UniProtKB/Swiss-Prot annotation:
Compositionally biased region (Basic and acidic residues): 693-723
Family matches, as Gene3D superfamilies: GHMP Kinase, N-terminal domain, K Homology domain, type 1, Nucleic acid-binding proteins
NCBIfam families linked: polynuc_phos (TIGR03591), PRK11824.1 (NF008805)
HAMAP family recorded: PNPase (MF_01595)
Similarity comment text for this entry: Belongs to the polyribonucleotide nucleotidyltransferase family.
Enzyme class, first EC level, given as a word: transferase
InterPro entries: ExoRNase_PH_dom1 (IPR001247), ExoRNase_PH_dom2 (IPR015847), ExoRNase_PH_dom2_sf (IPR036345), KH_dom (IPR004087), KH_dom_type_1 (IPR004088), KH_dom_type_1_sf (IPR036612), NA-bd_OB-fold (IPR012340), PNPase (IPR012162)
Protein name: Polyribonucleotide nucleotidyltransferase
Single GO molecular function: polyribonucleotide nucleotidyltransferase activity
Ranges where the record places region Disordered: 692-723
Function: Involved in mRNA degradation. Catalyzes the phosphorolysis of single-stranded polyribonucleotides processively in the 3'- to 5'-direction.
Cofactor(s) the record lists: Mg(2+)
Length: 723
């Protein structure tokens, strides 16, 4: 495959080209994907020998290059550093549909790297990378049961759209990524605006039709350039050893698995395993380490098979629940006195403490990646410490799993967040997982709903989440509601569904089998809705509506609208005016280009004071209005009176009184308060005032009255001489 070959088709109205044979020729397989003006190179490499361990060492990397959008990376080094959250989430998105399609017992290391070379904003580099990953694998000599493909699906005015453009995505009420093989769906990731289960299922199946077409396209590429698959040594237990271990442990393992409480069950299972392992250690075998590793693997498979048999055949779950039963629920709000809002949610032995923090809009997150620059005023972060599962270990920066679970919670809650106009705050949620026995990401969604209600955030509706599971033996399958850790680990599906009482707001599905049929997806969504409504009922029994007042420790934000041309007056030369207001009141001030002013502090009195100062600065006098101000300057021709901060007017000497005034000082002195009426605002914005207009006029003999000509009182000003 030394010569470049190009394969083309149409994808969502754009040209899709796959180029092989020119780039990255030393990789096991490589493909350059051109989708519109988006260009992504994906290379896959598989090791020749299996790696020690009892897991499949697959690594998927998605590398964003800032040059792909004509940008120079920020920071001192001016080069790409650690992956962005978006890159991390994309790597997970690609990993999830690919991983189930490697054979059981595959232990050779496989690494897939997608590098983004060029980005067309309307042609998703993520979907190009997913397609490239599949192509690189299927044309390589690495055994892989693909191809797979993925597509984005939107819905605009009831019509489904493949790979929506940025403009279309803004109008869509569904943001769905679905992946799978020609025969079945095996990965779903979605956010939505309270859509029905039926609409979501139709979106998934609509996407699958396009996936089928892309898989057929890849078959053409395989036929033309695909390599012969190499022979791989799969990890398989010794049949005699397996039978021996099974005979010694199966009865005890069955009893241990039926222990309902998690820690007690884990202890009982561990006791069975230790007993069997000790019996083999006592034999002092030559290849002891290898045998013990194999025995440990066999014991885990016995544990897995027995749990699956109990659920599938006996309809008994390890903790004794029915297949559609939710674990006991409890929740609490307001347990942290100094934070802005807090919610503790417990479901069985899974517990999440979520905290809501409110901040001025200036605290938003700026995201400057491969897309257009974004401003996020709503964030959800998820933390999973080792103590939550009773283990020790170092605390590191958030990993892929924590970033992924945080993003899922954010997506689930995004739709119910009030608009900036309705609630002008930056909102940050942090979910601390304190206990975990499955479904911790969904517990964080429930805890976050409680925390926002406790903080007084006027969300559109409460949101709850539930994780569904599946055990499939042949054609028989059992769908599980609210899965725990063991069911997640040994089951075939982790299907997370979040939403309000009116519809779905987020969806995430991962499976360990080849794919799922429409029937299973339909039943899982229906069963998930029942569980979600049950949890929502519990949440609203704890707190049914947002608190009417924000925490005393939360910033209070007042919004003021001024004319855009007045912004410069509020800011002042070099920021002098706005800094003086901040120094005087201690508030934070943000001004938008449209003239919207946000004033924030914990002290509402200071907010009001700052508002009053700004209103005075931007206030415009109107003819006929009456003001009480202080005399700031006296001249021979009249007195200058400060009507309000930043605005003076002139009371001409002839407007001080009805009778003739010889000297201004006979009527007014510096610092006097005087009530005046605006009689004119000239074309230059100068304000002429009258004191006598508010005084009762003394009666004058008819013959003494003389007509008065209209007067302009401001003295003429000379133009400054040019230097």
């Amino acid at each position: 495959m030394s010569e470049k070959q190009v394969f083309s088709t149409e994808w969502a109205g754009k040209t899709l080209s796959v180029e092989v044979g020119q780039l990255a020729k030393q990789a096991s397989g490589a493909a350059l994907i051109r989708y519109g003006d988006t260009v992504v190179l994906t290379a896959a490499v598989g090791s020749k020998k299996p790696r020690p361990g009892d897991f499949f060492p697959l690594t998927v990397n998605y590398e964003e290059k800032m040059y792909s959008v004509g940008k120079v990376p920020g920071g001192f080094l001016k080069r790409e550093g650690r992956p962005s959250d978006r890159a991390t989430l994309t790597a997970r998105l690609i990993d999830r549909p690919i991983r189930p399609l490697f054979a059981e017992g595959f232990r050779n290391e496989v690494q897939i790297t997608s590098t983004v070379f060029s980005v067309d904003q309307d042609c998703s580099p993520e979907m190009a990378a997913m397609l490239g990953s599949s192509v690189a694998l299927v044309i390589s000599d690495i055994p892989f049961e693909g191809p797979i493909a993925g597509v984005d699906v939107g819905r605009i005015d009831g019509k489904y759209v493949i790979n929506p453009t940025i403009e279309q995505a803004e109008k869509s009420d569904i943001s769905l990524t679905v992946a799978g093989t020609y025969d079945a769906i095996n990965m779903v990731e979605a956010g939505a605006k309270e859509v029905s289960e039926e609409a979501m299922l139709e979106a998934i199946m609509f996407g699958h039709e396009e996936i089928k077409r892309l898989c057929e396209f890849q078959q053409q590429i395989i036929a033309a350039v695909g390599k012969e698959k190499r022979e791989i040594e799969l990890f398989v237990s010794d049949p005699e050893l397996e039978a021996e271990v099974k005979a010694a442990s199966e009865g005890k393992m069955k009893a241990a698995i039926k222990t309902e409480e998690k820690k007690a069950r884990e202890a009982a299972i561990e006791e069975v395993k230790e007993e069997i392992l000790e019996s083999y250690k006592a034999k002092e075998l030559e290849n002891e380490a290898e045998i013990l590793g194999e025995v440990a693997h066999i014991l885990e498979m016995i544990e897995k098979d027995e749990m699956r048999r109990l659920i599938s055949q006996d309809k008994i779950r390890p903790d004794g629940r029915k297949v559609n039963e939710i674990r006991p629920l409890s929740s609490e709000v307001g347990m942290l006195p100094r934070v802005h809002g807090s919610g503790l949610f417990t479901r069985g032995q899974t517990q999440a403490l979520s905290v809501c923090t409110l901040a001025p809009l200036r605290e938003h997150q700026i995201i400057d990646g491969l897309g257009t620059e974004e401003y996020k005023r709503f964030m959800h972060h998820y933390n999973f410490p080792q103590f939550s599962v009773g283990e020790t270990g170092p605390r590191r920066a958030p990993g892929r799993r924590e970033i992924g679970h945080g993003a899922l919670g954010e997506r689930a809650l995004q739709y119910v967040i009030p608009s900036e106009e309705e609630f002008p705050y930056t909102i940050r949620l942090v979910s601390e997982v304190l206990e975990s026995n499955g479904s911790s990401s969904q517990a964080s969604i429930c805890g976050s709903t409680l925390a926002m209600l406790d903080a007084g955030v006027p969300i559109k509706a409460p949101v709850a989440g539930i994780a569904m599971g599946l055990v499939k033996l042949g054609d028989d399958y059992t769908i599980l509601s609210d899965i725990q850790g063991m069911e997640d680990h040994f089951g075939d599906m982790d299907f997370k569904v979040a939403g309000t009482k009116d519809g779905i707001t987020a969806l995430q599905m991962d499976i360990k089998i080849d794919g799922l049929s429409r029937q299973i997806l339909d039943e899982a969504l229906t069963q998930a809705k029942e569980g979600r409504l049950h949890i929502l009922e519990h949440l609203t029994s704890t707190i049914s509506a947002p608190r009417e007042e924000l925490s005393a420790y939360a910033p209070k934000i007042i919004t003021l609208n001024i004319k855009p041309e007045k912004i410069k007056d509020v800011i002042g030369p070099g920021g002098k005016q706005i800094n003086a207001i901040i120094d005087e009141t201690g508030v934070k001030i943000d001004i938008e280009q449209d003239g919207t002013v946000y004033i924030a502090s914990q002290d509402q009195a200071m907010n009001r004071k700052a508002i009053a100062i700004i209103e005075d600065i931007v206030r415009e006098v109107e003819v006929g209005e009456v003001y009480t101000g202080k005399v700031r300057r006296i001249e021979k021709f009249g007195a200058f009176v400060e009507l309000f901060k930043g605005t003076d007017g002139l009371v001409h000497i002839s407007e001080l009184a009805h009778e003739r005034v010889g000297k201004v000082e006979d009527i007014l002195k510096l610092g006097d308060e005087v009530t005046v009426k605006v009689i004119e605002v000239d074309q230059q914005g100068r304000v002429n005032l009258s004191r006598k207009a508010l005084l009762e006029k003394k009666e004058q003999p008819e013959g003494d009255k003389k007509p008065q000509a209209e007067k302009k009182f401001y003295p003429k000003t000379k133009k400054p001489e040019s230097k």
